Amino acid sequence: SERLKLYREEIIIMVDVIYFNMLLNIGLLVLIAALLTNLEFVRTLFLEEQSSIFSKTALAVIFGIISIVSTYTGTYTDGAIINTRVIGVLAAGLLGGPYVGMLTALIAGIHRYLFDIGGFTAVSCAVSTLVEGILGSVFSARFKSGKMKQAEICVLTAAAEVGQMVIILLISKPFDAAWHLIRQIAVPMIMMNSCGMLIFLRTFDMVFIRKEGQ
């Protein structure tokens, strides 16, 4: 019918907008990462042999701000924010270790909740942000040792996003509305954030490559 045709066209347009906006957001994160890695202060934080509490806290604040930017630049739809926040939180754990990862997750998670108090996905997205921090922290040692392949990073990011979808289904009510939301956002968020994570981490890797070349 004509109504069904119009509905399908609206869905296609919306999906295109989601992918385009996520691509822009990933580009913004990569630009921020590139600018940060050119700051002597930030490079020093990453390259310290024995990181102090100050250094770890500073890194957590930096990654927390990156994650907050991802929330603000996300696309609002059906009570949720389609965003790239997982990149900042997961990268914090992988690059900085458990302390940095969990503190970043707390900063980003609390902000996400306060950003939309009482919102459809406010609690579920805040909880999933903490889970992302845990995942990054758990795999930090493997990542830092260089044993983590690009495919594994993609799988880890995808797993974090799948976890977020499950948490939304478990916490956000009514279930039918949560399921309708997941059907719209799951594929673009899983695909785009998995690819974006690789590019983002590669930008920070340049810090260590530069060190080895000196």
Task: Describe the function of each predicted region.
Residues 45-52:
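Membrane-interfacial, low-structure loops and terminal tails that flank and connect transmembrane helices
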Residues 96-97, 110-116:
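Interfacial segments of multi-pass membrane proteins
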Residues 38-44:
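C-terminal ends of transmembrane helices
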Residues 9-38, 60, 74-86, 116-214:
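Membrane-embedded alpha-helical hairpins and interfacial helices in multi-pass inner-membrane proteins
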Residues 63-67, 85-90, 104-112:
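Hydrophobic, membrane-inserted alpha-helices
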Residues 78, 89, 93, 101-105, ...:
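Alpha-helical transmembrane segments and their helix-entry boundary regions
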Residues 56-75:
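A generic, lipid-embedded transmembrane alpha helix
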